[in-house]
């Protein structure tokens, strides 16, 4: 049993991933209000480079108004670059290639921060170290959330400690860890764990709704993430797939409602509300 909590005392928060732009974000917020789902973080996977300044600013405004963290992915990355290794193994898909890749990622962080974003998804160890060092040196906001990506999966306690030491504020775990293994990570580190309870097909495709109570008990504080299996990969997103991205975003919120209903039915003692409007550990935008 974990006694650790988020800054506002909660054991878990709801995260909706793959929110690819302001129109999708608006749809997620609308669906969350309609279904009474307390979404506290949205994350995006196409990357800062795939959003205009206006789109980033609008997402920052929406997040600030709703009290929702907005986490944008850093790139470019191996899977979209000229490297051939990512074509034969997904393990290289998130890496920043060469010093130029590190510099490009840093440029994306500085751009996002200037537009009000206070949370970024990091899929490369070198990028994480550089950003962690800059935050400690005061060259990036002290409130900046560095969220490791599922493309940089954490599968054991020692890795969790290493990631936290490099600067990770919140840690995406490997999608196939058991509740007891998640408990081992929790015993070793203080960073919240990001746990997919419905996993995209390209990350395993598991649906783990019935495990949520035990995950919360053993690994709190956790971000309960709702991916979608049996759904297309829409990265990099854009206007050509925006209607689909909106529908996928709404369905992720519906999936979250299903998880919360099950939690209330089976373990009502774990049911919690939305928490504080602006908890200190949430990367709410500052436009």
What are these regions (language model features)?
Residues 1-117, 122-154, 172, 179-287:
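Active-site pocket-lining/capping segments in soluble small-molecule metabolic enzymes
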Residues 166-169, 176:
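Hydrophobic, aromatic-enriched interface-forming segments
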Residues 156-158:
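Conserved nucleotide-cofactor-binding alpha/beta core module
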């Amino acid at each position: 049993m974990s006694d650790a909590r988020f800054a506002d005392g909660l054991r878990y928060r709801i995260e909706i991933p793959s929110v690819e732009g302001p129109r999708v974000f608006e749809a997620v917020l609308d669906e969350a209000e309609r279904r009474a789902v307390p979404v506290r973080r949205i994350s995006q996977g196409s990357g800062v480079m795939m959003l205009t300044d206006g789109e980033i600013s609008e997402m920052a405004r929406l997040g600030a108004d709703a009290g929702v963290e907005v986490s944008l992915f850093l790139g470019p990355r191996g899977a979209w670059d000229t490297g051939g290794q990512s074509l034969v193994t997904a393990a290289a898909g998130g890496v920043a290639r060469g010093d130029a890749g590190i510099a490009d990622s840093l440029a994306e962080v500085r751009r996002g921060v200037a537009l009000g974003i206070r949370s970024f998804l990091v899929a490369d160890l070198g990028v994480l170290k550089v950003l962690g060092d800059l935050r400690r040196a005061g060259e990036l906001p002290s409130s900046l959330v560095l969220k490791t990506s599922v493309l940089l999966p954490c599968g054991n306690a020692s890795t969790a400690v290493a990631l936290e030491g490099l600067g990770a504020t919140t840690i995406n775990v490997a999608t196939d860890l058991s509740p007891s293994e998640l408990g081992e990570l929790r015993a070793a580190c203080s960073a919240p764990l990001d746990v997919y309870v419905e996993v995209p097909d390209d990350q395993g495709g598991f649906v783990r709704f019935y495990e949520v109570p035990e995950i919360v008990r053993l690994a709190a504080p956790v971000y309960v993430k709702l991916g979608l299996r049996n759904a297309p990969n829409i990265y990099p997103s854009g206007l050509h797939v925006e209607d689909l991205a909106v529908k996928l975003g709404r369905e992720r919120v519906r999936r979250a409602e299903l998880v919360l209903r099950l939690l209330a039915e089976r373990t009502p003692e774990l049911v919690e509300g939305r928490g504080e409007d602006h908890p200190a550990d949430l990367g709410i935008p500052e436009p």
